[in-house]
Design a protein with these regions (language model features):
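Membrane topogenic/interface segments and analogous intrinsically disordered interaction regions
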Residues: 1-256
Length: 256
């Protein structure tokens, strides 16, 4: 029996199996993340230490735990985040196996490239934030505090929340060109229409940058908006390629 002919309850049973496999993979990755929490915290603190370089009077890079439960909360938060990241390849494979029978032949050929490019873009965005954006953002806040005559002493909860939101936000934002290409490939969105409404797109990108950035200051907003706009232009070029590719496929099918 083909997958499309399965009874509804059988589809629910398959979905239940997919959810259990994904949950097990994330759980195993979370356990590994909790077990290596010391090393993970060192990695997460690296942008903070980089922000201190070159300062005549560097601020203390030690994070504070003001609440009794702060260390446990941060450990679980980082553990789950590490679990999702470590299990992502396996989760994508399981989801792909579940979705594959329901897709047309042409759509099946797009599944692996979309997953691969999406993963690379997310990791690229997170690494861009980690090595370039986070140290500059932290340095900005330290300099601003010093200008106000304040000493920078951050809690581990506030720091990890800020760092993780920035990393995930940049990772998701870097998916923009892929989303634009997919919409063009499916015929939902046209490059010409997007190009004609570029000014509206710029406003939308500013709103997106403001939503993704944990703070509302212009400095961090700019750090998010500039790469977002570059990705938008890249996505616009990708939309043109996708439309040309779709037309070529249509012409070849028409001749046959």
């Amino acid at each position: 029996m083909k997958d499309s002919e399965k009874p509804f309850l059988d589809h629910l049973e398959d979905l239940r199996g997919v959810i259990l496999k994904c949950a097990a993979a994330i759980g195993a990755g979370s356990i590994l993340g909790v077990m290596s929490i010391g090393r993970v915290m060192e990695i997460l603190r690296w942008p903070l230490t980089q922000a201190q370089e070159g300062l005549a009077q560097p601020a203390p890079s030690t994070l504070l735990a003001l609440q009794v439960t702060d260390p446990m909360t941060v450990t679980l938060q980082i553990g789950i985040g590490a679990g999702i990241l470590l299990s992502l390849p396996l989760v994508l494979v399981v989801l792909g196996q579940y979705l594959l029978p329901a897709l047309a032949v042409r759509e099946r050929g797009l599944l692996l490239p979309v997953f691969s490019v999406g993963t690379v873009l997310f990791l690229g965005g997170a690494l861009f934030c980690y090595f370039l954006v986070l140290p500059k953002a932290l340095r900005f806040f330290q300099d601003f505090n010093r200008w106000l005559g304040l000493e920078s002493s951050w809690t581990m909860t506030s720091y990890t929340d800020f760092a993780l939101q920035m990393l995930v936000g940049f990772g998701l934002s870097f998916e923009l060109p892929l989303i634009m290409v997919i919409l063009a490939r499916l015929g939902i969105l046209e490059q010409k229409v997007v190009s004609e409404h570029r000014r509206h797109a710029v406003v939308a990108l500013l709103v997106l940058a403001a939503c993704v950035t944990p703070t509302s200051d212009p400095f961090n907003l700019g750090l998010m908006f500039v790469p977002l706009y570059a990705l938008f232009e890249l996505g616009l070029a990708g939309m043109g390629w996708a439309e040309r590719h779709a037309r070529k496929q249509g012409d070849s099918l028409g001749r046959t």
